[in-house]
């Protein structure tokens, strides 16, 4: 099953009520039917004043309940470099003696994300073509399209409609830990035949660790599902498709499930 739910960077979007969404006047900036330029610009809602009211044939499905939800998403990166450079000293008048300079470096980084919720509620809707057509014909949406369509691509434009939301209830927590470490070493070795190896060496280590956490006691919209609506100058009509995590055109952002 393809992943299509994208988490929001902020936890300050209050959940909308079903009645407010059905009536076309949602009380949250993250509501079903909202049109946005991208997930990175969730605050820039194109139809912020009002959304097209849902027709009776296009109801909201949910809530689907998920209880005692835990999500751990961690990344760890590491990089190491090393090498040795031999420098013969014979041209300098010291026969059969070699000078070796060794360089080494290491870098590591780890980032951990952890969410825990008592309860998640999932709401989705399936927009019909007639509903989407009414949405893009609203004055504020037409103005946005006229201003942002690409003349370099023959008038192409795209917007994203929120078609699903996941509301976190019961107080979620988010913890992050970031650790970085650096090591840099230099070693100089003199090698002389039949003589014990000797030489100066130097090493430097630096380490840095940051740990922080936030708690969220109120309910908020945690994740959204999106439909991409786009029209090319080469086509007479627009098309719509659900955005999945593997979709490269969605700026590389990954879906969680």
Curated annotation (Swiss-Prot):
Signal peptide: none
Membrane topology: Multi-pass membrane protein
Keywords on record: Cell membrane, Cytoplasm, Membrane, Necrosis, Transmembrane, Transmembrane beta strand
The UniProt record lists the keyword GTP-binding: no
Localization in the cell: Cytoplasm; Cell membrane
GO biological process: programmed cell death
One term of GO molecular function: wide pore channel activity
Keyword Cytoplasm on entry: yes
Any single GO CC term annotated in Swiss-Prot or TrEMBL for this entry: cytoplasm
Stated consequence of mutating residue 129 to A: Impaired localization to the cell membrane. Abolished localization to the cell membrane
Subunit-structure text: Heterooligomer; the heterooligomer with rcd-1-2 forms a ring-shaped pore complex when inserted in the membrane.
Family, as annotated: Belongs to the gasdermin family.
Function, in words: Gasdermin-like protein involved in heterokaryon incompatibility, a process that ensures that during spontaneous vegetative cell fusion, only compatible cells from the same colony survive (non-self-recognition). In N.crassa, the rcd-1 locus exists as 2 incompatible alleles, rcd-1-1 (this entry) and rcd-1-2 (AC P0DW10). During the allorecognition process, forms a heterooligomer with rcd-1-2, thereby forming a functional gasdermin-like complex that binds to membranes and forms pores, triggering cell death. Binds negatively charged phospholipids, such as cardiolipin and phosphatidylserine.
Protein name from the UniProt record: Gasdermin-like protein rcd-1-1
Gene source species: Neurospora crassa (strain ATCC 24698 / 74-OR23-1A / CBS 708.71 / DSM 1257 / FGSC 987)
Gene this protein is translated from: rcd-1-1
